[in-house]
Amino acid sequence: MKKNILYSILVSCTAVLALVSCSKEYLDTQPEYAASPDVIFSDADAARLAVNGLSKMMTTQYLSTQGMNGEGTIKSWYGNFTGNDMQKCNQTGWAALWNSTYQERDTSPYDYYPWFYYYKLVGNANQVICGIETDGEDVASELKFIKAQALCFRAYSFFMLSQLYSHRWVDSNNGADPGIVLRIDLSDGAQGLSTLAETYKQVYDDLDLAISLFKASGISRGKGEFYAPDLEVAYAIYARAALTREDWATAAQYAALARADHPLMSESQYLDSGFNEPNDEWIWGVYEASDQTIYYYSFYAYQGSNASSSNCRSYPTAISKELYDQIPETDSRRRLWLEPTEEEYAESKLNKTTGRSTGLLQTRAFKEFGDKLYSTSLVFMYMQFKHMCSFYPGGGSFNIFRSAEMYLTEAEADCHLNKEAEAQKLLNELNKNHDSAYNCTKTGDDLLTEVKLYRRIDLWGEGFDWFDYKRWKQPIVRKSIADGGSFHSTFAITLKPTDANNWTWVIPNKEKDYNDLIK
């Protein structure tokens, strides 16, 4: 895939045919675009190209808007910058978005983007799913594997859409509230919203079938193909979806399965390269090659500490002081952020509104973290060095799922299942590479709080922040520097669970204009 990925937009049969129109089998036997989808998807090589196209769609620029880059935008704009624990330092011009004031603006591109992106994935996946018939006895193993991959893309997309455009499960009347549009065939006419319960049922059904097909195929993805869904990816999607649905036993079951063959990264990997260089902990990820870069649209062009993009050099990302202060002194993960000393904080060259330093803290930052900064980067207190680009201006790969999330998912589920010893063991296993002094003995509500804390610490900056706070039904509370926190006063807000349309993005006007079954 790395040099030959084909980006496909398979929203129509014609586009599917265009994807494979250069394949010699069709050039030799039929005119361009003459082959039927049944013929195309009976050929494993052609079907594989279509699934590779789905992977490429996760790192592609969209809507002619800088920064809308596929999956990375969802992580940064919708998961991180709008959350409780990350600040886009001094980027006050974007405060309306980062402070969650766009949820009810149905004509905004920020409301429309996730809908557009995930339904583009769904439409493409449906071409593969509907084009490959797997009920017969003579179906090639690879076709089963490819169909299972497409089912993973669809299940993941439906799940992500439900997190954004539907109420949190606890407020959904046990799933009776509106879900999303469940397009599972090639029709494109008007279609109403499902319920949220129906949405989760479809996600589960897709994953059940994917798991069955993966197992029946007897195939594993190739070494290094972290961008391609496989059996463990299906397990991981299942675990995350079940956790969000508060289906605790299912979440614990699939989290354990998903992480079984993906050991946690070492301490050195975690501190230096574990988030932009694929490693064994990654279960699924997004691949961006230097010869296929999307330049200033890329994920790391928005939150890479060493990126050359002005968005990172001038407005780096930083952890909240409140979260940083809860990380034990013995925990090596503290080294991923720039904590000011008392002297560095007290000097006049540290701006007490923005948190920017032009003095002692700046000097130390370039001395200690010079290889993780661009030469002209501005320095702010608590700025991060966890996420770095692999090539300029801000390119590189990143994970969607990794084992640490599965440990934390299983631990959170175990808390709700009254399996306290199991949850304690999972936390100890997760943290031993970072803090040799760590030993969890907490119980009850304190144990659940501990799991949530380490989820915030270990998965910081990976796109979970806003989504976790939504499902937990906890308020976002950001404190300004003047009030003992680290946020610019423009971002220092409290967002209650009932604010911002209950943290639910409205159905975009573009969909309602086209689909008269949605009002």
Model-derived regions, located:
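Hydrophobic-face positions in mid-chain alpha helices that act as interaction patches
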Residues: A252-N399, S403, D458, K473, ...
